[in-house]
Amino acid sequence: MKMPLNIGLIHFVGIGGIGMSGIAEVFHNLGYKVQGSDQIDNANVKRLQDKGIQVHVGHHAENLGDAEFVVLSTAIKKTNPEYIAAKERHLPLVKRAEMLAELMRFRRAIAVGGTHGKTTTTSMIAALLDAGSFDPMVINGGIINAYGTNARMGEGDWMVVEADESDGTFLKLPADIAVVTNIDREHLDHYGSFAAVRDAFRQFVENVPFYGFAVLCIDHPEVQSLASRIDDRWVITYGANPQADIRFLNLSMDGQKTYFDVFMRSRKTGRETELKNLVLPMSGQHNVSNATAAIAIAHELGISNESIKKGLAGFGGVKRRFTQIGSWRGVEIFDDYGHHPVEIKAVLCAARESAKGRVIAIAQPHRYSRLYHLFDDFAACFNDADIVLIAPVYAAGEEPITGFGARELVEHIQMAGHRDVRLIDCLEDVVSIVSTFSKSGDYVVFLGAGNITQWACALPNQLAVFDNNDKFSAD
């Protein structure tokens, strides 16, 4: 049965989160009564309020009001006063993925999974479907620059969603097409073991109906291994791997643009197709890989080669995905969400390939549990940065773990052989180091899923203030 409109008020706890805000926005646009609360008055909260959605800042039992249903972010604990109040009133408690599944139930759906690259790949698929006049609904884990939001209504039959594997609820999503970009050691605090992560992604693919298909990146050993174990579903492989069904090759980069070709070979018919001289307005092989997943789906859905080329060339990117936010004396400043060693390594590799000068990385570790599980990987992921600045850990509600903090990470990176890694405490430290050591042509790259983005956005103005003060002193 389709979810009726007259179900009453839906209350979202943690509505300011990137995933929750998109779902709440779409339900509001569909005509449902929506409200919510969040601990922080952030940009997502303001966007929802501007659309007429009531959002309380802070979590309190009385925020529920006349709510009939309560939707919970994965970050909400059982000690949350709104959770407790909902339990006392015997209100249905709904997980974020369940609400997303309701939206997907009556459209043909593409779900993008993987431990990294989901947000960009989701955005690229949406862009190519848009270029092919599919007019898709989109719910993403990041702000799509072309839309100015992470949610898009769309009137077409297709829907594109980011499938968050962090708590296992992505297995609830009824997808016709499933994408797996990669599988790495992540969210072990939930899964308990990497074997459990592998099993979850296998189930994600096997949940695809017999008339659907999976799109798997076989450049990643774990995903190639997964592909070999899927024998009852249609699988399309992609990557730089010569054995991939959809293969990208002949890469060249010019600043923030990447040029490449794609060779496509159908397992069903044996037909071979080439797409040459593709232009992606982003740097980095990892972004070309993400684009190739989108091309694979667009091609399979019958979107013309010309529309694919046009959609790719016009792709506007995603907020906080190697986003240039300013410059100072020829030094380019970027902000990126990367917080896992694999993501950090890919971003810094892209920066190294496109920068004319050096790369200065400012990283804010996200969660003590992630540092604990991936400590050695973090020590080895900064090789493409000439200078590494490590900020205090963004705890995200976790308690510190002895021996796994920012200072210990700096020491571990040094022991792994990096020649210039430093501990910093605040934005003023960044201003001092960048103003002293950077030169025209250098890239400054902020990395992290916490509030490091605020430092990134503030740095250009802080450097301008430094210039003014320097000029004043000289006068």
Swiss-Prot record:
Matches recorded under Gene3D superfamilies: Mur ligase, C-terminal domain, Mur-like, catalytic domain, NAD(P)-binding Rossmann-like Domain
Pathway in which this enzyme or protein is active: Cell wall biogenesis; peptidoglycan biosynthesis
Source domain of life: Bacteria
GO CC terms: cytoplasm
Protein localization: Cytoplasm
Keywords: ATP-binding, Cell cycle, Cell division, Cell shape, Cell wall biogenesis/degradation, Cytoplasm, Ligase, Nucleotide-binding, Peptidoglycan synthesis
MF GO annotations: ATP binding; UDP-N-acetylmuramate-L-alanine ligase activity
Binding site for ATP: 114-120
Documented EC number(s): 6.3.2.8
Catalyzed chemical reaction(s): UDP-N-acetyl-alpha-D-muramate + L-alanine + ATP = UDP-N-acetyl-alpha-D-muramoyl-L-alanine + ADP + phosphate + H(+)
Biological processes per GO annotation: cell division; cell wall organization; peptidoglycan biosynthetic process; regulation of cell shape
NCBIfam families: murC (TIGR01082)
UniProt similarity note: Belongs to the MurCDEF family.
Stated name of the protein: UDP-N-acetylmuramate--L-alanine ligase
Organism of provenance: Bartonella henselae (strain ATCC 49882 / DSM 28221 / CCUG 30454 / Houston 1)
Primary gene name: murC
